[in-house]
């Protein structure tokens, strides 16, 4: 529904695929027919019964169009803004058909094996396999992210057997290799149609170290592959929205695509609808990442309307989290809960410190979100302050310079995770953060991180503490380690001490490890944020900083996207730094000095 004005008589046609009728100025009229509307002020309301698909309409007249100015309801409750997306711009478009693009990929190599013909398509992708075959033949297709998986049918995660057709367009799958075996004539014209969401790469990064550019490109490709209807965790498995994984994708998105729509879609998909009966993905920390991520989305974009619409759900989720705390006021494991944090040797025998620091940040986020929609956030801030005092009392060990995992088991075990969170979210003073960095993060006796997931968080903490060289070295050794082993996308887990096909095993499955996992895209954010040095200093990048740091690189050259199509380019060597931006509000911070960055012209500082 909406109110609008027409300066003259106009013809309006409401196009829809559903049962519906339109009311204009209290006149009930049919859809999918031309309606003559006189000049003047009008009120229009459309009632739709959509038994299948999304209830949707299309109007494109002189004075009335379908856009974001409409509101809707479900005949109960108050109106909310409609959903729109510029991917659908004509009456022939169907919002139930997601706007993927396709590119035909031919195999780069074909070899005969005992299990059939092995087709190598050159790199990981998500594609529809197409081929011609003898209708009388039975054809088996085995998919593999590695050639070993594709040629071991008994252990491969995805296999498909077809018969009875002369041509096949198989269900889209994730793979680099397929092994095809027929009991009749060999299938012909085997190709793959790469299916992807056509997001534009609006960022770049290069330096004097060529391997870094390759790592950056593969990380960008990994994020591309997992950017679909929503941010997925991986394209082979689980092809699912996991909130912690998605939280990292939101961050990388802002430094590669800066596409608000996919972040919003993912947040909405994860939120679902109240009442909440379990944590998001059943994981306590993932519920909190969703609330924290919603606030960070607002801070990056300034999209207040989105928060206003979904605040009631965020509030309901927070109340669910709060309602499952224990007598000490701590997040704890209730029946059905999964205390995850990371795949690591963490003492989870009682209340877990990392969970409590996330809960503290979650309360701060709720305070800001509440104030944004005109409600009082003070109660959340006071609760956060009380929680912080308790965490410092129970978990902090001054003599060891870090937080223990759990204070009730007597093990006094220190891992990196809680200490990383403490730095990332400014939970501790700078003095204590430096102590944590020295005594925990730079301490090789503390168990190392084994997943790109929490390795990303650790590098965020190190970057925040000015340890850029350590970040750069880890990118080259950890992410670069996968690339040197032939990875064309970043893996779910990488253990450098493993060899051969050991890298592919996980969860008790020989090929269970995902070789294309979105949480591997961290260097996109890390290099854009801490090397090129671009970050917002107020909501929606109304003001922002460019604080470049070469670290161990001799020169850097890159671009970071900004909201509303803006961008900032940074070039820096040992003597000069040049910044070019298309958006006002930027400040260059270099060697302790600040410079206002002009818009639309190269700004160079010698140092």
Protein language model annotation of sequence segments:
Residues 273, 408-412, 441-449, 477-483:
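Solenoid-like repeat scaffolds
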Residues 1-229, 262-263:
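Extracellular/oxidizing-compartment recognition motifs
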Residues 472-607:
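Non-catalytic C-terminal accessory modules of carbohydrate-active enzymes
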């Amino acid at each position: 529904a909406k109110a609008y004005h027409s300066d003259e008589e106009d013809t309006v046609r409401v196009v829809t695929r559903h049962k519906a009728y339109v009311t204009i100025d209290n006149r009930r009229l049919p859809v999918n027919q031309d309606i003559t509307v006189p000049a003047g002020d009008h009120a229009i309301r459309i009632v739709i019964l959509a038994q299948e698909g999304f209830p949707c309409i299309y109007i494109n007249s002189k004075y009335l169009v379908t856009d974001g100015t409409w509101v809707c309801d479900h005949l109960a409750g108050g109106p909310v803004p409609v959903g729109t997306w510029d991917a659908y711009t004509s009456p022939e478009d169907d919002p139930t058909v997601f706007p993927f693009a396709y590119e035909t990929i031919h195999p780069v190599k074909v070899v005969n094996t005992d299990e059939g013909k092995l087709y190598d398509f050159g790199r990981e992708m998500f594609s529809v396999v197409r081929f011609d075959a003898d209708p009388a033949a039975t054809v088996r297709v085995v998919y593999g992210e590695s050639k070993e998986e594709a040629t071991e049918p008994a252990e491969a995660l995805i296999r498909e057997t077809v018969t009875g057709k002369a041509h096949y367009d198989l269900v889209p799958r994730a793979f680099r290799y397929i092994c095809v075996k027929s009991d009749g004539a060999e299938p012909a014209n085997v190709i793959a149609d790469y299916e992807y969401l056509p997001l534009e790469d609006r960022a770049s990064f290069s330096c004097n170290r060529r391997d870094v550019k390759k790592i950056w490109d593969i990380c960008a490709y990994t994020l591309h592959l997992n950017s679909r209807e929503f941010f997925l965790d991986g394209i082979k498995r689980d092809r699912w929205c996991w909130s912690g994984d998605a939280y990292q994708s939101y961050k990388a998105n802002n430094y590669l695509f800066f596409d608000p729509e996919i972040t919003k879609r993912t947040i909405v998909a994860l939120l679902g609808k109240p009442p909440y009966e379990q944590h998001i993905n059943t994981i306590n920390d993932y519920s909190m990442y969703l609330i924290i991520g919603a606030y960070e989305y607002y801070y990056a974009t300034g999209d207040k309307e989105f928060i206003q619409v979904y605040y009631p759900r965020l509030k309901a989720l927070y109340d669910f989290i709060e309602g499952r705390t224990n007598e000490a006021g701590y997040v704890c494991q209730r029946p059905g809960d999964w205390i995850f944090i990371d795949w690591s040797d963490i003492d989870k025998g009682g209340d877990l410190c990392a969970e409590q620091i996330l809960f503290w940040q979650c309360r701060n986020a709720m305070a800001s979100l509440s104030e944004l929609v005109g409600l009082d956030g003070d109660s959340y801030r006071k609760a956060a302050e009380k929680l912080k005092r308790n965490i410092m009392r129970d978990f902090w060990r001054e003599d060891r310079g870090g937080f223990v995992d759990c204070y009730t088991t007597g093990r006094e075990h220190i891992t990196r995770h809680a200490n990383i969170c403490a730095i990332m979210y400014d939970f501790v003073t700078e003095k204590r953060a430096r102590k944590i960095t020295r005594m925990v993060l730079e301490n090789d006796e503390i168990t190392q991180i084994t997943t790109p997931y929490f390795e990303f968080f650790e590098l965020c903490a190190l970057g925040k503490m000015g340890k850029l060289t350590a970040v750069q070295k880890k990118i080259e050794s950890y992410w670069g380690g996968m690339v040197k082993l032939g990875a064309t996308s970043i893996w779910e887990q990488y253990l450098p001490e493993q060899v051969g096909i050991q890298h592919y095993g996980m969860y008790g499955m020989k090929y269970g490890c995902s070789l294309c996992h979105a949480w591997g895209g961290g260097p996109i954010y890390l290099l854009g944020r801490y090397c090129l040095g671009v970050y917002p200093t107020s909501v929606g990048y109304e003001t922002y900083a460019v604080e470049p740091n070469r670290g161990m690189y001799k020169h850097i050259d890159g671009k970071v996207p900004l909201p509303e199509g803006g961008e900032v380019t940074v070039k820096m060597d040992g003597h000069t730094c040049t910044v070019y931006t298309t958006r006002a509000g930027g400040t260059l911070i270099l060697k302790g000095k600040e410079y206002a960055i002009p818009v639309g012209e190269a700004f160079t500082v010698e140092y």
